[in-house]
Structures are given as C-alpha cells and as structure tokens.
Amino acid sequence: MTQSRRMLVLRAVVEDYIRSQEPVGSTSLTRDHDLGVSSATIRNDMAALEDEGYLIQPHTSAGRVPTEKGYRYFVDRLATVVPLSEAQRRGINSFLSGSVSLKDALQRSARLLSEITGQVAVVTSPSLAKATLRHVEMVPVAMTTLLAVVITDTGRVAQHGLTIASMPAVDEINRLSNTVNEQCVGLSLSKSAETVRSIAASAGYESVRGVADALADAFESMALDERANELYMSGTSHLAHSRSLTDLAPLFDALEEQVVLMKLMSNLSEETNASGVGVAIGSEMHTPGLLHASVVSSGYGRSGEAGEPAGNDPVGEPETESETESQTNDMEPIAFVGSIGPTHMDYAATMAAVRAVARYLTAFLSEGRTQD
C-alpha cells in the first residue's frame, strides 16, 4: 500500500475504532477528519483497504474495523509516539521516587503502568544471567551445608544452598569469600563460576575446594534458571471491562504461564522499533490465549548517560525519534516492562507509557538505588 491518502484513511479508521470500538463508516470519517475528499472517494479507499487485508466489514450494513494486518501497518508506519507531557512525567516521578528498594520500584512501576494504560502491566526483575556480581557471602547453616547469599549489581539478592562433604574452618571459608569478592566483582555469574573454579584449583585453597566447586555450580545454576526472575503483574481486573475480550479464560491461562510470558516479552523488548518499544499483535505471539490481545514491551537496564536524567526528571523522555534511538542503543536491556491489552488498545499512548516507565527504571538502576 503506497497511496498516501489511503494511509491517512487507514490511520483515521484505526484511531476512530480505538476510540469508539464501533465499526467506522465513510460518513463519520468525512465529518471528523479533514481528508480533503468526498465520502464516495473514502468509501472506495476503504473498499480497497479491505481487499488488501487491512480492514474488514463485520456486517454488510456496517462500517469497517481494522484487521491484525491493519493494526501492524498502523503501529509500524502511522502511529506517532508523542513524549509524555511534563505534568505526566512529574507524576510518574512523584509516584516512583519514593521507592526504597528495587523490589518496591518494580511493584510501584507495575501498578502505575496499569493505572496509566487501563491494561495489564508486567514488570520483571533484572535477569540473573545478565547481572554481574557485587558481593557474595557464605554462611554455615548445618554440618554439611552453607547458605550462599549473592548480591548483584542490580540489587537482586539470591540465596543458594551449598552441600559439601565436610565443613572447613570458618576462617578458611571467609578467606575464600574474600578472594571471590576480590576477583569476581563486576563479572557475570557464568564468568564468576569460571574464576571460582580457577581459585579452587590454585595452591592454598585445598581445604575449601569442595566449597568453591559448590559455589561455582550455584553461580552457573542461577545464571541458567529463567524461573529465578521475578515477575510483577498488576491490572488483571481491567480485562473484565474490555468489550472485545469476551472469553477471558484463555487469556487468564496465558497470564498464568509466567515463564512463557517472560520469554515472549523478553524477546519482544530486544526487538524494539525506533521508538524504543516492541509491539506484538494477536497471532504474532503464537499463544492461543493472546490471539485477541496485543503486547507492548520495552527493555530497561544498565546505562551510562542514556538513563541518567537531566535535573530532577528521572523519566528523561526524549524529545525526538533520533534521541530515542540513540538512548535505546546506549542501553543494555536486562529486564523488561510490558503492557497487555486488547488489539484495539491505544498503541501510541501505551507505547509512550511503557517507554517512560522503562526509562525510569533504567535511571533507577544507573543511580544505584537498588539495595534491598
């Protein structure tokens, strides 16, 4: 579809349907939009759009509604993501700035995003696979068991039991802990595992070799365990108020499959468009429960300058598309923020809200306010 007028007609149909959730006719388009052509010409354009698969007519006497293909073209080519207003950004700042820990910030973010969009909001904790080690402590808890407390650069605290054949002296365990902290801080958990195995094989650590091997195994296990990522969800009650989602059972079943949901949104947040968000519509997700839903997702994570806001505005919304793309490229996503709603969701508003909350969490991590 290359005709510019037809693109304008498609955008008008999608925007009107999102607003009214009623089939859109040529008469209302002529009345409500300055398209510069007659109602008959618009009817012809709508018929052509229907033939091309962008619109569908649910009843012969009704107007048209967008198809999945129509929504996709709208999101990719026609939707304009406008940065949030200063008042909206300060509202987000006011609500989220009171966070006292990473967990608190993630829970607040999910609630806030749900309230802004009127849809289900999903926020995940930073992936342990992409985190780096900040500190590890090993504490004997039984004759042959230690508890390893692992703190990452993102503030995640993970605990893992270490089973060994015999318990070394506490001084030897502490010496091993100090060496691991000296050599592994700033390394990924998988790299830390390699380093710990090297320490275990070196002279002077024979008495704690079993402990070191168990700790290395724990690091590797945590790095590979997708279930270790925590998911915070808010706003499922909004689904009951959506007129288009009449059969909610499959959708609720899909929301219960947290590992599947996290994989879907994680992949989506890494395939962002120029606006810094990823959008999946209906059948694109290959998940039966989400057939009539859309998902908007954006990654958040480590950032140098990109996540550091100017002044007292931690949301730091970009003003232009080029600024957004530059900031997105500078940020390494380690978790995601997402919104789930009907296919007739307000894409532009949802994309802006998801992007803003993701940028706040990036700034939150960059400022180091993550200690639980």
Curated annotation (Swiss-Prot):
NCBIfam families: hrcA. Negative regulator of class I heat shock genes (grpE-dnaK-dnaJ and groELS operons). Prevents heat-shock induction of these operons. GO terms for molecular function: DNA binding. Gene3D superfamilies: 3.30.450.40, Heat-inducible transcription repressor hrca homolog, domain 3, Winged helix-like DNA-binding domain superfamily/Winged helix DNA-binding domain. SUPFAM superfamilies: GAF domain-like, Winged helix' DNA-binding domain. Keywords: Repressor, Stress response, Transcription, Transcription regulation. This is Heat-inducible transcription repressor HrcA. It comes from Bifidobacterium longum subsp. infantis (strain ATCC 15697 / DSM 20088 / JCM 1222 / NCTC 11817 / S12). The keyword Oxidoreductase does not apply. Belongs to the HrcA family. The keyword Plastid does not apply. Residues 296-331 are annotated as: Disordered.
